From Swiss-Prot:
This is Subtilisin-like protease SBT4.9. The C-terminal propeptide is autocleaved. Residues 1-24 form the signal peptide. Keywords: Autocatalytic cleavage, Glycoprotein, Hydrolase, Protease, Secreted, Serine protease, Signal, Zymogen. InterPro entries: Peptidase_S8/S53_dom, Peptidase_S8/S53_dom_sf, Peptidase_S8_Ser-AS, Peptidase_S8_subtilisin-rel, Peptidases_S8_3, S8pro/Inhibitor_I9, S8pro/Inhibitor_I9_sf, SBT. Residues 25-113 form a propeptide. The gene is SBT4.9. Residues 117-560 form the Peptidase S8 domain. GO terms for molecular function: serine-type endopeptidase activity. Its EC number is 3.4.21.-. It comes from Arabidopsis thaliana (Mouse-ear cress). Glycans are attached at residues 176, 215, 223, 420, 536, 583, 627, 637. It is an enzyme of class 3 (hydrolase).
Length: 713
């Protein structure tokens, strides 16, 4: 998701907040609207099964109509089974009761969440970074987003050979759109063509896998080389999002095609305002079937922070990414006539050349504004003012259509005091500049927080990555301020949001896959989580704990050699869903095979790289256990010893049994149990610790979080 100026919803890896907008088609008798009918996996034997014919027959049976072509919107038939159709409420109810149907849910509208960042992560350009270019060139990342700008230099195929032989996709992108050996595939589900109008999809794709392009900047600000984490990788663009958002049926269509086309990873920077259960969340559905085919899905956490429980990506088979800043930030200085200087946040490309203008702190209406710098509590974009100084301070720089700077409350009050106490107050707003941010990384305020409200014992988000003030390729069809009054057009622009952090982690996942092409999605996810930089709970609120950053900040270099990994297969996820009380009939359809939910599998015992448990508030003392199994991907004859590090303020007692793991061979698996006990947990904060398995070379770290807090508290 990215953040835009003014009403710009945070764009997060597509995550401007998920606004629900159901489109209805009026019939003479009842209103019809688009519903998605999810039917699980495709039959294992498809010789006599034609998905579309089955879907049409269901519609004929339910509607009583012989011709239902006008009812069918999409048929999902390549990677999983289902369809989207226009139904009345009573027809929806009848479909939901039919054998072979897992769920029926409305087609809601998802929206997008929107150079130095890779250097900050340690994945530097040049010979000092280890790369496997042959496999990197065979790695394909699919982006489900707003399309792509194919002419961008970031997607040039100079030096690229033909697409990998495994590629089964097409370039079905519309008129005047050409794919190449870098951008090897494009599909459109919006009827607009795959060309990116918003700029969001172009930005995310270039962040993960764009070519290295020298001397890029935003009007001279932040000059450097723009590049992706895996610039030799191939890109496939799936346009599921238009200016109006991203429909459920389009998102599922994109997953259906991307999986069958042969992508290796999926990056999706989209999200919703309301969390959805797994069987009604199109991203969770698509990502599950991708996981079964060996494809990891990376999704933005959302831009609903710092509110607790705002994380919308909550499935354990998805790698969920929060957003943090880097050591490069953009600031805009305000210089007053009395010589005082204040440092604010914005991305101001306008140069007033130090000229002073009258400051005006009155009404925002009328001719008194003309030719002045307006000092107001909120951002304005009036065309008659020279510039704007406001109190709308955020921890990210926004692009405006006129010179502006957002100050902290104290600094803004100082400016107001100067305006009110001076006969002829004047000042100026300088052009933005890049500064070194020594305090980085810090989770952005807009980044969505846990706890997970669907599976309370699964910690989300998983990790954090750069998502603040990211410079990357952009669509010249949109303005950098994303405002129709802004007549500027740029090839590279700066966006903030979890939409920007998501492709960073997609790039990291692709980087790992170039060294370990045989690794499963869960192994890659585990490597990223257990090697992440530890972050500290810097505040006294839930929003400043592991619910903000998960396992920590991604470290690409460490992640290619994690030592141990936590593996999770399809059967483990099915057992997890059994533990959440999904019935065996629905799970059989989802899994495409017989399922028996025997006993009660505790969701917290899913072999996840982090450990989390929500405790009953009624219990003053507690004991919880976590069962885990690790696989050795390091060296043979290695011995790992466990170490527990309690976080500040935690009074937990943590025991690990066995406390030593002796791995004789690579791929060997060993199990252990973590027992956590304590009493009187703070009802407003989690208590946490870290389990570290170390063999002297590798440090395999897992956060342990116990809490009683509820979002409704």
């Amino acid at each position: 998701m990215a953040r835009r100026a003014d009403s710009f919803c945070l764009i997060s890896c597509v995550l401007v907040s998920f606004v629900i907008s159901v489109s209805a088609v009026t019939d003479d008798s009842q209103d019809k609207q688009v519903y998605v009918v999810y039917m699980g996996s495709l039959p294992s034997s498809r010789l006599e099964y034609t998905p579309m014919s089955h879907h049409m027959s269901i519609l004929q049976e339910v509607t009583g109509e012989s011709s239902v072509e006008g009812r069918l919107v999409r048929s999902y038939k390549r990677s999983f089974n289902g369809f989207a159709a226009r139904l009345t409420e009573s027809e929806r109810e009848r479909v939901a009761e039919m054998e072979g149907v897992v769920s029926v849910f409305p087609d809601i509208n998802y929206k997008l969440q929107t150079t130095a960042s890779w250097d900050f992560l340690g994945l530097k350009e040049g010979k000092n970074t280890k790369r496997n270019l042959a496999i990197e060139s065979d790695t394909i990342i699919g982006f489900i987003d707003s399309g792509i700008w194919p002419e961008s230099e970031s997607f040039s195929d100079k030096g690229f050979g033909p697409p990998p032989k495994k590629w089964k996709g097409v370039c079905s992108a519309g008129k005047n759109f050409t794919c190449n050996n870098k951008l090897i595939g494009a599909r459109d589900y919006t009827n607009e063509g795959t060309r990116d109008i918003e700029g969001h999809g172009t930005h995310t794709a270039s962040t993960a896998a764009g070519n290295a392009v020298k001397n890029t900047s935003f009007y001279g600000i932040g000059n450097g080389t723009a590049r992706g984490g895996v610039p030799a990788s191939r890109i496939a663009a799936y346009k599921a999002c238009s200016e109006m958002g991203c429909t459920t049926e389009s998102v599922l269509s994109a997953f259906d095609d991307a999986i069958a086309d042969g992508v290796d990873l999926i990056s999706i920077s989209l999200g919703a305002n309301l969390v959805r259960t797994y069987e009604t969340d199109p991203i969770a559905i698509g990502a599950f079937h991708a996981m079964v085919k060996g494809i990891l899905t990376v999704q933005s956490a959302g831009n609903g922070g710092p509110n607790p429980g705002s994380v919308m990506s909550v499935a354990p088979w998805i790698l969920t990414v929060a957003a943090s800043n880097t050591n490069r930030g953009f600031v805009t200085k305000v210089v007053l006539g009395n010589g005082k200087t204040f440092v604010g946040k914005s991305l101001n490309a306008f140069d007033l050349k130090g000229k002073n203008y009258p400051l005006y702190g009155g009404s925002t209406d009328g001719p008194l504004l003309r030719g002045k710098i307006l000092v107001s509590e909120d951002k304005v974009s009036s065309e008659i003012v020279v510039a704007n100084i406001n109190e709308n301070y955020h921890d990210y720089a926004y692009v405006s259509i006129l010179p502006s700077s957002a100050l902290s409350k104290d600094d803004f009050d100082s400016v107001i005091s100067y305006v009110n106490s001076t006969k002829s107050p004047h000042g100026t707003v300088l052009k933005s500049e890049a500064i070194f941010n020594q305090a980085a990384p810090k989770v952005a305020g807009f980044s969505s927080r846990g706890p997970n409200t669907i599976a309370v014992d699964i910690l989300k988000p998983d990790v954090t990555a750069p998502g603040v003030e990211i410079l990357a390729a952009f669509s010249p069809l949109n303005s950098p301020a994303q405002d129709k009054r802004d007549n500027r057009h740029v090839k590279y622009s700066v966006l903030s949001g979890t939409s920007m952090s998501c492709p960073h982690v997609a790039g990291v996942a692709a980087y790992i896959k170039t060294f370990h092409p045989e690794w499963s999605p869960s192994m890659i996810q585990s490597a990223i989580m257990t090697t992440a930089w530890p972050m500290n709970a810097t505040g006294t609120a839930v929003a400043s704990t592991e619910f903000a950053y998960g396992a920590g900040h991604v470290d690409p270099i460490a992640a290619i050699n994690p030592g141990l990994v936590y593996e999770i297969g399809k059967s483990d996820h099915i057992a997890f869903l059994c533990g959440l009380n999904y019935n065996a009939t629905s799970l059989k359809l989802i899994a495409g095979e017989a399922v028996t939910c025997t006993g009660k599998t505790l969701p917290r015992n899913l072999n996840y790289p982090s450990m989390s448990a929500k405790l009953p508030k009624s219990e003053s003392s507690f004991i919880v256990t976590f069962n885990r199994t690790v696989t050795n991907v390091g060296t043979p004859n290695s011995t790992y010893k466990s170490k527990i590090v309690l976080n500040h303020g935690s009074n937990l007692k943590v025991e690990v049994s066995p406390s030593v793991l002796s791995m004789k061979s690579v791929k060997e698996k060993q199990s252990f149990t973590v027992t956590v006990s304590g009493s009187n947990i703070d009802p407003k904060l989690p208590s946490s610790a870290n389990l570290i398995w170390s063999d002297g070379t590798h440090n395999v770290r897992s956060p342990i979080v116990v809490y009683t807090y509820s979002v409704s508290d």
